[in-house]
Every structure is written in structure tokens, then in C-alpha cells.
Amino acid sequence: FLGTINLSLCEQERDADEEKRDEPDESDVEVEKRFLPAALAGIGGILGKLFGK
């Protein structure tokens, strides 16, 4: 049993201009930028619990 893995994502305040997207691809890139660090941190935490002593 690995226990509970708690990930918290930081929510940053953004200007209205930054939220406005002209191209659909731009929003996909922004989602990737937000998701990947959290996913890597979660994977690192799991591996640390599996292989850590």
C-alpha cells in the first residue's frame, strides 16, 4: 500500500489579456504547461515511495 499521494496545484492569477486565446492550439500548450509539472511530481513521489528506504 503506497498511502495517500497528495498533489496540490498552484493556481496563478492571470490577466484577462493572457486568458484571451486567438488560436485553439495555444490553449492546448497552456494546459500542457500546467499539467506536466504536476504529473512529473506525482510520478516522482510514487517512485520515491517504491524505491526509497
From Swiss-Prot:
Keywords: Amidation, Amphibian defense peptide, Antibiotic, Antimicrobial, Cleavage on pair of basic residues, Cytolysis, Fungicide, Hemolysis, Immunity, Innate immunity, Membrane, Secreted, Signal, Target cell membrane, Target membrane
Biological processes, Gene Ontology terms: defense response to bacterium; defense response to fungus; innate immune response; killing of cells of another organism
Cellular location(s): Secreted; Target cell membrane
Modified positions (Phenylalanine amide) in chain numbering: 51
Major subcellular site: secreted
Entries under InterPro entries matching the protein: Frog_antimicrobial_propeptide
GO (cellular component) term, any one: extracellular region
Signal peptide region: 1-10
Source species, domain of life: Eukaryota
Pro-sequence residue ranges: 11-34
Its biological purpose: Non-amphipathic mildly cationic alpha-helical antimicrobial peptide with potent activity against Gram-positive (including methicillin-resistant Staphylococcus aureus (MRSA)) and Gram-negative bacteria, and some fungi, as well as against Trypanosoma and Leishmania (both promastigote and amastigote forms). Strongly and selectively perturbs anionic bilayer membranes by interacting with the polar head groups and acyl region of the phospholipids, with formation of regions of two coexisting phases, one phase rich in peptide and the other lipid-rich.
Assigned protein family: Belongs to the frog skin active peptide (FSAP) family. Temporin subfamily.
Protein's recorded name: Temporin-SHd
Species this chain originates from: Pelophylax saharicus
